[in-house]
Structures are given as C-alpha cells and as structure tokens.
C-alpha cells in the first residue's frame, strides 16, 4: 500500500489510498463521510434505487484499515450516517460489526450536517475535538488554525496521455486537511472549483486516491 506522508503543525500524518488519514504518533485513524444508510434513505424517499451493499463495503474497508494500522483511536469526522434514522435502522449484523471494531479502542463520532444527533452505538459523540494543535470538525472553517475536516467530498480530475481520470482526493495546505468521503455511495466536488478553491490556499495540493496516492497541485487539476 503506497501512502503519502506530510506534516501539519509539525505533526506527521499519513494519507492512505482508501481515503483514511493515519496519525501514527497518536495511533489515530480518521475517516469522514461514511454515509451509512444512503441506499435505504433514497429508497424511503422514493428517489432512487441502488444496491443496498454500501454499508458492508465501507465497513470492510474500514476494518482493513484498522487492522493494518492497529489504531487505538478512531475519529469519524461527521456524516457517518446519511440521516439520523439511518443510525437507528442498521441491520443487526452491521451493528455487531461496528461493535466488534470498537472493542479495545476509543471511538469518537463527530457530528455532521446529515447526522447532528448522538448515536446509541457506543463510543463518544462530540461536535469537535482538539488534540494538541490539531482541531477536528466536520466542516472547514475560516479560522486560522490547524484543522482536519471533511464534508465536501473533494475529488480531482486529471488528463494523462489523453485520458481523463477522476478520483477522490485529500486536500492539503499548510493549515488544513480536507478528507475525501470514505463511504461507497457518495458524490463529490471538484477541488479546483468553489467553494473548495476559496477555502484552500493557493499552494494547496490534492492527494489523489486509488491503488496508491498521487500528489498533484490543485492548480494542475482539469
């Protein structure tokens, strides 16, 4: 697995190809926008029908990342559930899967715009979290602080040898990191368009996910 190491406020962080962020010194794995229950919410609203397997796929990738890092703490950066009802209607096997992953580690749910209410799923529920100089919350702010967030589902499009590729990506500048969506069924916003273009500093880079991480200046995105 080819990851990408970088530093924010003298803290070494690791962007993983899956879209997870690993903080080795603190043994913290951070993921954002899992959006459990999206297919069931769309079905309830009669908007669309997509195969109801996204939870299992997302949980399997998360379990793989937890196993590979042996993380002692996990931070879910908001929109872990597609709505508040989704957190109450997970199938029993998926609830047990989450419970199994929570065993022996600290688990923190950060509130998001899709899931602002506490969950009865174990772990802690917070609106934000500060660890040292790093501030974890769902949506990036305009404050001049070192910040880890999600929400926007950033993606990047590049043209290589005449072929167009679109992938989820991390966005990184000297003050902040915006994580890609980790959930299976999620759309995204192009990193070189507003509001992301306005949020990130001019020298920001995108870390394109896939089988390995590719760093690309946002200015080079198509």
Could you describe each region identified by the protein language model?
Residues 1-77, 81-222:
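Extended recognition/assembly regions associated with phosphoester-bond processing machinery
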């Amino acid at each position: 697995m080819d990851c990408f190491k970088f530093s924010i406020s003298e803290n070494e962080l690791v962007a993983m190809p899956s879209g997870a962020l690993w903080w080795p010194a603190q043994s913290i794995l951070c993921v954002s926008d899992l959006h459990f229950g999206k297919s069931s919410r769309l079905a309830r609203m009669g908007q669309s029908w997509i195969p109801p397997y996204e939870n299992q796929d997302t949980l399997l990738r998360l379990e793989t990342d937890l196993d590979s890092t042996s993380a002692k703490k996990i931070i879910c950066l908001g929109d872990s559930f597609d709505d508040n009802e989704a957190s109450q209607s997970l199938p029993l096997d998926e609830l047990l899967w989450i419970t199994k992953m929570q065993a022996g580690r600290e688990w923190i749910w950060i509130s998001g715009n899709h899931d602002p209410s506490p969950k009865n799923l174990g772990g802690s529920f917070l609106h934000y979290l500060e660890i040292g100089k790093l501030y974890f919350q769902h949506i990036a702010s305009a404050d001049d602080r070192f910040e880890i967030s999600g929400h926007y589902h950033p993606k990047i499009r590049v043209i290589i040898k005449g072929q167009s590729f679109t992938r989820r990506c991390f966005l990184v500048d000297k003050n902040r990191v915006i994580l890609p969506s980790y959930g299976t069924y999620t759309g995204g916003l192009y990193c070189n368009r507003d509001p992301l273009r306005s949020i990130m500093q001019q020298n920001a880079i995108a870390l394109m996910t896939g089988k390995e991480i590719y760093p690309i200046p946002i200015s080079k995105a198509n």
